């Protein structure tokens, strides 16, 4: 099975270390353009753009990067409850047309009640999923060309329609992640690709089986994806050293403050991430080559695959064997790590999209002694 592998645009900041200004990267439009173009050149099929108050707006960033990329797809957030489904569908169709079919959409219900309240949304966890289901029902139908009348518990629209359709037919794909039963029910009923964060394979297997069964009960099939960080180096020893360096500036107070902030979330997925490390820096390898150190201070995806290229590829294949065909990866800093993943990991994967063909002056490395083209090294 060929794999769809995406990268990540760090619109909420970037750097060489977590939880410290040491090695912090100035993230501006020029830097995001560099990361997007590096991802495209290395053969990533698309990029995920995060959402939330700590991030630049994902739609505006994606739109700004369309003209400076050619094949790269942009996975941007849909936020039910804070925008009308009709307006969101219109924006989605426009982004898909502007990008000539390179727009993908990620349904994000939100997991931080404090942040949601600041955005004007005062629904409980269960109510948010009710509203998300209504939103998605309307959004999908509009993009598929229907005229929609809908009167739900949370959303009502009358004679809603789009005048300009998307490029992708019947509509752009819809991604979604969530670990609660309400989230899984929504995925089974309406989404195209269900995402999970990088839990150990046995936990992921159980979760995917639940969603697969729920979808089958609806007469549907759902694709699967996973969100992971990656720390890949020429040797596994070097990769683990890089993992240790990434959190080398974290002190106990920084970790405790981060975990206290994340504990207020009502996201089941966030609770599952926190349980993997327990807020402690010891015993962070929770499964072979799966490291939970990033989740000590980062919300959302908090685990990384660590190792040399062949080892990380083996771990990715273990997830692929569970039925996962889409891998959304990232690494710190995101510019350099995009190249490392492309150079050290991709030769060991069966990719759905290959690196962008380049007409370079010299693509074989620096000439040796002004005379010899460097010899080709076989991958092992």
Swiss-Prot record:
Under catalytic activity, the entry for this protein gives:
an alkanesulfonate + FMNH2 + O2 = an aldehyde + FMN + sulfite + H2O + 2 H(+)
Q: Which InterPro entries does this entry report, sorted A to Z?
A: Alkanesulphonate_mOase_FMN-dep, Luciferase-like_dom, Luciferase-like_sf, SsuD_RutA_monooxygenase
Matching entries from Pfam families are given as: Bac_luciferase (PF00296)
A GO MF annotation of the entry reads: alkanesulfonate monooxygenase activity
What family does this chain come from, according to its entry? Belongs to the SsuD family.
Function of the molecule:
Catalyzes the desulfonation of aliphatic sulfonates.
Q: What is this protein called?
A: Alkanesulfonate monooxygenase
């Amino acid at each position: 099975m060929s794999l769809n592998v995406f990268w990540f645009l760090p619109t909420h900041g970037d750097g060489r270390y977590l939880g410290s200004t040491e090695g912090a990267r100035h993230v501006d439009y020029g830097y995001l353009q560099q990361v997007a173009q590096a991802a495209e050149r290395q053969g990533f099929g698309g990029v995920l753009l995060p959402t939330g108050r700590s991030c630049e707006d994902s739609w505006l960033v994606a739109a700004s990067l369309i003209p400076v990329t050619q094949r790269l797809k942009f996975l941007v957030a849909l936020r039910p409850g804070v925008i009308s489904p009709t307006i969101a569908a219109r924006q989605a169709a426009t982004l898909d047309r502007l990008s000539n079919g390179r727009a993908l959409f990620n349904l994000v219900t939100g997991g931080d009640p404090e942040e949601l309240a600041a955005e004007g949304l005062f629904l409980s966890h269960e109510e948010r999923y009710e509203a998300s289901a209504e939103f998605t029902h309307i959004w999908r139908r509009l993009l598929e060309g229907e005229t929609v009348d809908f009167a739900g518990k949370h959303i009502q629209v009358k004679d809603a329609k789009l005048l300009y359709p998307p490029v992708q037919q019947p509509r752009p794909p819809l991604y979604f992640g969530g670990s609660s039963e309400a989230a899984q029910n929504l995925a089974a009923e309406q989404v195209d690709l269900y995402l999970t964060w990088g839990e150990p394979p046995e936990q992921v297997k159980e979760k995917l089986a639940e969603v697969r069964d729920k979808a089958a009960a609806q007469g549907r099939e759902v694709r699967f994806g996973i969100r992971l960080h990656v720390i890949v180096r020429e040797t596994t020893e070097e990769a683990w050293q890089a993992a240790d360096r990434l959190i080398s500036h974290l002190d106990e107070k920084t970790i405790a403050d981060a975990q206290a902030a994340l504990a207020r979330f009502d996201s089941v997925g966030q609770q599952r991430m926190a349980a993997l490390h327990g807020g402690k820096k010891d015993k962070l390898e929770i499964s072979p080559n799966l490291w939970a150190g990033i989740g000590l201070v980062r919300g959302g995806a908090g685990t990384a695959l660590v190792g040399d290229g062949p080892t990380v590829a083996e771990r990715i294949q273990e997830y692929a064997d569970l039925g996962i065909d889409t891998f959304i990866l990232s690494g710190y800093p995101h510019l350099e790590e995009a190249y490392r993943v492309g150079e050290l990991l991709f030769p060991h994967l069966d990719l759905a999209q290959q690196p962008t063909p380049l007409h370079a002056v010299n693509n074989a490395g620096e000439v040796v002694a002004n005379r010899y083209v460097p010899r080709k090294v076989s991958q092992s």
